[in-house]
Amino acid sequence: MKIGVPKEYFIEGIEKGVQKEIDGAIAKLRELGAEIKEVSLPHTEYGLAVYYIIMPAEVSTNLARYDGIRFGHTHGGGADIAMSRSEGFGKESQRRIMLGSFVLSSGFYDAYYRRASLVRELIKDDFKKAFSEVDIIVTPTAPSVAWRIGEKVDDPLKMYLSDVFTVNASLAGLPGLSLPVGYSLPEDGGTTELPVGLQILGSELGEEKVFEVAHVLEQAMKEYVNSKKPSTF
């Protein structure tokens, strides 16, 4: 089994505790007999921008039907469609609908959505090339452990940045999962260690290998992970 580790995913900004647990999980895979190989996904840096253009566009078209007439919440017996949509969607949904409508609007489609779609193909090609060399790719799931409930609700940019390691797999249409491989203290001064996830990615329709690697690693690390689990979990 050849397992790829993309160099672009191990960047400045990963919390030290997260890096330590991820390194430990990769070392365990090597110990279990896997061949660990560095791979390159050169268009990784564009993934977040591309995702947050394409995803809201899909959201806005998908949710357009929820006008309170045939689908969704209805305000005042259907007298006010605008109020039906305002009341029926939360702030984040509204934000994504508005952003998606903007990037699909006349004059901006080519500048944003079309260009993002072209870069998406480059990201797909990066993964295809990498999977011609390895069977599985592993990365951190996120650069940090989870933040406190409600902490970044009013800062969507920071919320979106936490997706930096997972969006490219979605853009490329790849199967993946996040496996807890340890615990780490938040670097913002938290006092409770929180789970660290290892993202395990397979090639297109390669779910079986993803589950296989995840199961073997989970069994091998169960004692270690359980020994670090805080009493509050």
Model-predicted segments: where are they?
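Serine-dependent amide/ester hydrolase catalytic core
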Residues: 9, 44, 67-171
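Short secondary-structure junctions
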Residues: 35-39, 73, 227
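Active-site phosphate/pyrophosphate- and oxyanion-stabilizing loops and adjacent acidic/basic residues
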Residues: 61, 166, 215
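Gly/Ser-rich, acidic/histidine-flanked active-site/gating loops
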Residues: 1-59
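Short low-complexity, flexible loop/linker segments enriched in glycine and/or proline
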Residues: 50-56, 153-155, 186-187, 193, ...
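Structural helix-boundary/capping segments
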Residues: 1-12, 23-32, 65, 95-125, ...
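Short glycine-/acidic-enriched loop or helix-start segments at secondary-structure transitions
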Residues: 14-15, 48, 109, 147-150, ...
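Short beta-strand segments at enzyme active-site cores
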Residues: 37-41, 139-140, 176-180
